[in-house]
């Protein structure tokens, strides 16, 4: 019979079990089936056991030899090595797959546990296995939630990517090192980790690996190293860019400066303030009163940093004595001023940035309120520009601060300078540090001396008054004695304080004898005969008569403080005057003027309104003809005045555009008047750029451009350098206080006289006025030296005085 042979079966033995295999006996079995004998199988004599006898047919070669050759070839083959090498990677992939499968479930459970109505989604009873398997929607939501949390953290801190990259990098190094350690029995774990790090940082290292599996691990590490370093480089670049952006914005940077000046806000006053501070620094360096070559100035605003840097670069070219720093931040936060080192500043200037007067005062109050929590602010002067004097008491009430409110009096200045020729030049002179300016100085060695002795004693200055208890008095009595705490107010060039003690003090001591009293009496009597005494109550600022001139005024433009302009015009003009406002602003927005008229604050002027564009030729022509025909039938000769004002929003946002519109309107008005043959007494306009105004006046001498914004800015800057001067300028710019006037010389002398400036000062004092200079031949001279020499003046010349609107004649013989 044909026999069927069952070949040898042998279990698979791993290489690690090879030694054990060699030590054990072989369990090879062979079974051959032959034809059975007729007698069948013989049973053994022992119960329960039997023997099977096998017989091989065919090949008689021993079976163990073939099996050994097969095993040796199998262990050395390439498939075997690949299978063995992939087993660890397969294990890692399975673990990662397990984690990936379990992660959505964990996220889902955590989210459901945090939701107050999570139980509502589990209303239908499900199989526990189905409950454990998350839906695809939950998986997507969980992944989106994880990505959202990561991006949120990334927005807060860009360094999150850097941390994640480092963790992933070291994880790959550890895993790769463990793989190397698995297949390198003769290498320590430390060397394997270092080898993995070398493959990560140097892509050429994986080429040095000997086995394919090690090369595969090195290749993976090299690829990840390239990805890691590219991402790391981009992250570091972005982090550096973000840091530089914060540095450029300056919002979170701490200023480490001292004795610097902080300016909050940007408007049309800023360039003039910088000009004044630059001039003051030049004189301080020249006099040796400062050790710093440049004055550090910090410009703070809520505008973007790029715009501020452009302004700073433009200003740096013109003001070489200033070192301008910029900081973009909120002006209503205490943290902003703390980072600006406000407690170490020399002064703080807060400028308005809004057109509405209420917004100006509100922003100013909030900025000052933000300074209140900062310590050591009692000695730091804070100069705040406000729209009205009503804010004085409110700002002064904030404890712990030295607040100096400065009222924005550009409207009053514009009217004053338009009514009095050369007054704008006098203001500029008194605010120019290279010329004569207001000074306040203590003289302890002169304590007890009478004010008359002080007036006549100083020959190099013009004594203007006394500052006592924070209040300035321009008209003390001659018998008033100087107290130790008083400060003398005078006009002189800017000098060191100690130099004033070296001035000549002639006539300081006057003997109070009968002869001297008689001499003084005779001098007063002689002077009173040569002057025109003031009335007991003046009704006009521009004239000593009982009523001002009657005029017709055409006001072109509109802004919120027009009411102040009308009030100032009302104090210069006489009864029966008229004022018409032409603007494209609706009548509903002009109710403030009507309310002032209704309350009786405007007495001499009748106000009317017209709606139209004052830059339109036909509209402006119609308004001028209407003003001309209004008094044509009357017998009186009514003078016509045309004034142009700038829009407040344009002054704050684009001053150059405001100047262009004002200049064009004034030139258009002059052209129309010339064509119609209308005689205009005064053509005046506001302007910010004084260079443009001078350029136009060279071509058109009949036009007047008044830089009231510049004067107000110079006042603010001067108060920042000496806060005590705020009371001086407050009184001068106040409509109800003392003001600077340019008065005809015929009020103080007779024709043919040649009095000295000292004599003119004494005659002005009899009129309760303070003479500070004169205008001779169109040239102004303030604080003339010497004062005792005769001055040849014509009757067309003028005397510059500081006077009150209502000054009673108190001089008695």
Curated annotation (Swiss-Prot):
- Annotated membrane-spanning segments are 161-181, 216-236
Between which residues do disulfide bridges form?
none
* Database matches in InterPro entries: CASTOR/POLLUX/SYM8-like, CASTOR/POLLUX/SYM8_dom, RCK_C_sf, RCK_N
Q: Residue ranges of the RCK N-terminal domain?
A: 258-407, 550-712
Q: Does the keyword DNA-binding apply?
A: no
- Major location (coarse): membrane
Q: Which GO terms describe its biological process?
A: potassium ion transport
Instruction: Extract the signal peptide range.
Output: none
Keywords attached to this Swiss-Prot or TrEMBL record, sorted alphabetically, are:
Membrane, Transmembrane, Transmembrane helix
| Location of the protein in the cell | Membrane
GO (cellular component) term, any one? plastid membrane
Q: Topology with regard to the membrane? A: Multi-pass membrane protein
Please give the Gene3D superfamilies that the UniProt record associates with this protein: NAD(P)-binding Rossmann-like Domain (3.40.50.720)
Family assignment?
Answer: Belongs to the castor/pollux (TC 1.A.1.23) family.
- Read off the PANTHER family from this record: ION CHANNEL POLLUX-LIKE 1-RELATED, ION CHANNEL POLLUX-RELATED
Protein name in the entry: Putative ion channel POLLUX-like 1
Q: Which organism is it from?
A: Arabidopsis thaliana
């Amino acid at each position: 019979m044909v026999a069927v042979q069952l070949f040898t079966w042998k279990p698979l033995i791993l290489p690690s079990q090879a030694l054990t295999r060699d030590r054990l006996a072989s369990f090879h079995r062979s079974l051959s089936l032959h034809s059975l004998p007729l007698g069948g199988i013989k049973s053994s004599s022992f119960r329960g056991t039997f023997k099977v006898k096998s017989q091989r047919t065919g090949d008689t070669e021993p079976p163990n030899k073939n099996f050994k050759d097969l095993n040796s070839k199998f262990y050395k083959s390439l498939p075997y090595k690949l299978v063995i090498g992939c087993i660890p990677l397969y294990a890692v992939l399975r673990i990662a797959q397990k984690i990936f499968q379990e992660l959505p479930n964990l996220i889902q459970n955590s989210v459901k546990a945090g939701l107050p109505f999570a139980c509502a989604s589990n209303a239908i009873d499900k199989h526990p296995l189905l409950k454990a398997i998350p839906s695809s929607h939950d998986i997507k939501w969980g992944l989106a939630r994880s990505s959202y949390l990561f991006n949120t953290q990334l927005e807060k801190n860009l360094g999150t990517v850097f941390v994640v990259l480092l963790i992933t990098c070291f994880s790959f190094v550890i895993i790769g090192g463990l793989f190397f350690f698995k297949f390198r029995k003769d290498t320590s774990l430390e060397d394997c980790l270092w080898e993995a790090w070398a493959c990560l940082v140097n892509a050429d290292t994986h080429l040095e690996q000997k086995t394919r599996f090690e090369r595969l691990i090195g290749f993976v590490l090299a690829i990840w190293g390239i990805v890691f370093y590219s991402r790391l480089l981009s992250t570091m670049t972005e982090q550096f860019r973000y840091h530089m952006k914060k540095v450029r914005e300056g919002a979170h940077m701490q200023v480490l400066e001292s004795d610097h000046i902080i300016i909050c806000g940007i408007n049309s006053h800023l360039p003039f303030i910088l000009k004044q501070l630059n001039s003051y620094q030049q004189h301080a360096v020249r006099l040796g009163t400062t050790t710093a070559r440049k004055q550090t100035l910090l410009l703070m605003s809520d505008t973007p940093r790029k715009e501020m840097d452009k302004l700073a670069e433009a200003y740096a070219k013109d003001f070489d004595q200033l070192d301008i720093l910029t900081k973009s931040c909120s002006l209503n936060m205490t943290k902003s001023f703390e980072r600006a080192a406000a407690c170490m500043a020399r002064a703080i200037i807060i400028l308005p940035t809004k057109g509405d007067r209420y917004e100006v005062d509100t922003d100013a109050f909030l900025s000052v309120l933000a300074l209140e929590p900062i310590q050591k602010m009692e000695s730091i002067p804070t100069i705040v520009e406000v729209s009205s004097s009503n804010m004085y008491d409110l700002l002064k009430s904030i404890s712990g601060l030295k607040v100096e409110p400065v009222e924005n009096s550009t409207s009053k200045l514009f009217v004053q300078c338009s009514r009095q020729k050369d007054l704008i030049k006098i203001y500029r002179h008194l605010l120019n540090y290279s010329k004569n300016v207001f000074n306040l100085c203590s003289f302890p060695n002169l304590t007890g001396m009478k004010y008359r002795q002080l007036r006549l004693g100083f020959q190099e200055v013009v004594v203007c008054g006394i500052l006592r208890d924070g209040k300035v008095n321009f008209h003390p009595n001659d018998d008033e004695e100087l107290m130790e705490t008083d400060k003398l107010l005078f006009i002189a060039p800017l000098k060191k304080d100690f130099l004033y003690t070296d001035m000549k003090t002639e006539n300081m001591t006057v003997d109070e004898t009968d002869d001297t009293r008689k001499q003084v009496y005779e001098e007063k009597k002689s002077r009173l005969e040569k002057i025109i005494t003031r009335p007991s109550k003046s009704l006009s600022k521009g004239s000593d008569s009982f009523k001002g001139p009657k005029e017709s005024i055409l006001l072109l433009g509109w802004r919120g403080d027009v009411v102040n302009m009308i009030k100032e015009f009302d104090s210069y003009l006489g009864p029966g005057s008229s004022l018409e406002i032409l603007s494209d602003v609706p009548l509903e927005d002009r109710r403030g003027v009507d309310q002032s008229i209704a309350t009786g604050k405007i007495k001499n002027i009748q106000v009317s309104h017209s709606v139209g564009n004052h830059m339109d030729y036909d509209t402006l022509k119609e308004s001028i003809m209407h003003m001309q025909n209004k008094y044509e039938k009357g017998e009186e000769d009514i003078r016509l005045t045309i004034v142009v004002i700038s829009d407040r929003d344009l002054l704050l946002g684009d001053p150059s555009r405001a100047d262009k519109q004002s200049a064009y309107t004034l030139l258009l008005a002059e052209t129309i008047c010339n064509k119609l043959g209308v005689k205009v007494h005064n053509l005046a306009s506001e302007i910010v750029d004084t260079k443009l105004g001078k350029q136009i006046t060279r071509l058109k001498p009949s036009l007047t451009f008044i830089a009231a914004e510049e004067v107000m800015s110079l006042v603010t800057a001067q108060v920042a350098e000496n806060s005590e001067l705020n009371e001086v300028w407050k009184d001068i710019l106040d409509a109800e206080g003392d003001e600077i006037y340019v008065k005809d010389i015929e009020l103080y002398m007779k024709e043919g006289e040649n009095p000295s400036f000292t004599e003119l000062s004494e005659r002005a004092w009899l009129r309760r006025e303070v003479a500070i200079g004169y205008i001779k031949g169109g040239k102004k001279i303030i604080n003339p030296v010497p004062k005792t020499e005769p001055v040849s003046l014509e009757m067309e010349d003028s005397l510059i005085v500081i006077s009150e609107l209502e000054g009673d004649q108190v001089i008695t013989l």
